[in-house]
From Swiss-Prot:
Record-level GO BP terms: chaperone cofactor-dependent protein refolding
Name the record gives this protein: Co-chaperonin GroES
Phylogenetic placement of the source organism: Bacteria, Bacillati, Bacillota, Clostridia, Eubacteriales
Subunit text: Heptamer of 7 subunits arranged in a ring. Interacts with the chaperonin GroEL.
Physiological role: Together with the chaperonin GroEL, plays an essential role in assisting protein folding. The GroEL-GroES system forms a nano-cage that allows encapsulation of the non-native substrate proteins and provides a physical environment optimized to promote and accelerate protein folding. GroES binds to the apical surface of the GroEL ring, thereby capping the opening of the GroEL channel.
Secretion signal, residue range per the UniProt entry: none
Length: 94
């Protein structure tokens, strides 16, 4: 991947949503909620604070849960990604 986020930003690839509910109902695209779970594919160097770089807590390969309306959606090489600040990440899964 050639995207390198700046500062405390993280690039995430959203994980696909379930096509069916637990009861077996197939969800149309219009009824699906915006994804909130993804995999970290790139991490910035961290933000500068008082002349020191604060390293991010997440790393490439982490599965994370993030705020529903956080970040900026971008398309690169035919793939869709989300670029957001580390503070928009709510939890690391696993």
């Amino acid at each position: 991947m050639n995207i390198k986020p700046l500062g405390d930003r993280v690039v995430i690839k959203a994980l696909p949503m379930e096509e069916k509910t637990k009861s077996g109902i197939i969800m149309p695209d219009t009824a699906k909620e915006k994804p909130q779970e993804g995999e970290v594919v790139a991490v910035g160097p961290g933000k500068m604070e008082k002349g020191e770089r604060i390293v991010l807590d997440v790393k490439v390969g982490d599965r994370v849960i993030y705020s529903k309306y956080a970040g900026t959606e971008v398309k690169y090489d035919g793939q869709e990604y989300l670029i957001l600040k580390e503070t928009d990440i709510l939890a690391v899964i696993g």
